[in-house]
């Protein structure tokens, strides 16, 4: 037991290790490795060894690539390099671009493909010879080729992407068929036409420039019918000042003369005739509007029109009656008519008194369409007032002491401004 028993504590590890025996030193779990520096001779030997390994690996890769591009031909097992233009290519056996049935003349694996149909054509033969020449040049370039001096010109292949001149093809074909045809006797034009037929089997119709007019005329005579009526007349040009323009100018001159006779420049205090005509048009439009409003008020009794009068009105005077003097003169000459004249006078006075109740003037409509107001013996002009955007009602108020009342008479429909003629 440890000495800490009396204290009530657990024994510590140090106490237990010290009691159990000698203290063991902790050992490292990962020990560093001491790397010794190589000498110069060892480093050079290692570098040369790595270099040799890389060169051997590069040679193996090159040999593998060359073997991949070679194909075994015949029983001798000779390896020949395949032409570069045939890499990543394949023969189409069906479809519009199919190569058809292919045969080989010698039966070896490295053989040219020749279509059985039309294989004797000079174009095919020329292409095969060119391919063989290209294959021979590619064979000379190969480093690991065993048979460098062997040339297989008899091999026949298709031209895959190479071009030839048309003259060379035609010359080859002419050389091959010299025994069967008489091409020697052909002149330049026939030889050129034959070459064009070989290149372009379907010849387009060509027309010389000097024959264009003749061809057009011949086609028109063959397809078009003769006209049965006269040709369409051309557009007729007339001077601008005739017809309607002259009539308008005459009417404008007449209107200006009438305006000058009326003397509207002084009435409207305008500068020129155009301004006077514009003022006259506005005045006529106002009078027509007022006349329509008055007719509408006559049909609808509950409609009223507001008249804006000047602040000072002329004194209303009863018109003098000349008939009274004439009646007094005729009383002595014709006593039998005295009673009738007296009755007529009484009736006129009675009517005049009734008409004057609440009436201060009248609106007159002239033959020209102009409107005017006559108040007493004074004639005034009228014009259209400003329209309101809200409703206005006319109300009659009674302010009697015993009982006051208000009565709605109707609605205001328009406004007229009365101006005196100065």
Curated annotation (Swiss-Prot):
Residues 28-37 have a biased composition (Basic residues). Pfam families: RNA_pol_Rpc4. Residues 38-64, 160-170, 219-229 have a biased composition (Basic and acidic residues). Residues 138-148 have a biased composition (Acidic residues). Keywords: DNA-directed RNA polymerase, Nucleus, Phosphoprotein, Transcription. Residues 1-80, 115-190, 219-244, 318-350 are annotated as: Disordered. The modification Phosphothreonine is found at residues 228, 232. It is found in: Nucleus. Its main location: nucleus. The modification Phosphoserine is found at residues 137-138, 178, 182, 224. GO terms for cellular component: nucleoplasm; nucleus; RNA polymerase III complex. One of its GO terms (molecular function) is DNA binding. A motif (Nuclear localization signal) lies at residues 25-29. GO terms for biological process: termination of RNA polymerase III transcription; transcription by RNA polymerase III; transcription initiation at RNA polymerase III promoter; tRNA transcription by RNA polymerase III. Belongs to the eukaryotic RPC4/POLR3D RNA polymerase subunit family. Present with 998 molecules/cell in log phase SD medium. Component of the RNA polymerase III (Pol III) complex consisting of 17 subunits. Interacts with RPC37/RPC5. RPC53/RPC4, RPC37/RPC5 and RPC11/RPC10 probably form a Pol III subcomplex. DNA-dependent RNA polymerase catalyzes the transcription of DNA into RNA using the four ribonucleoside triphosphates as substrates. Specific peripheric component of RNA polymerase III which synthesizes small RNAs, such as 5S rRNA and tRNAs. Essential for tRNA synthesis. The RPC53/RPC4-RPC37/RPC5 subcomplex is required for terminator recognition and reinitiation. This is DNA-directed RNA polymerase III subunit RPC4. The gene is RPC53.
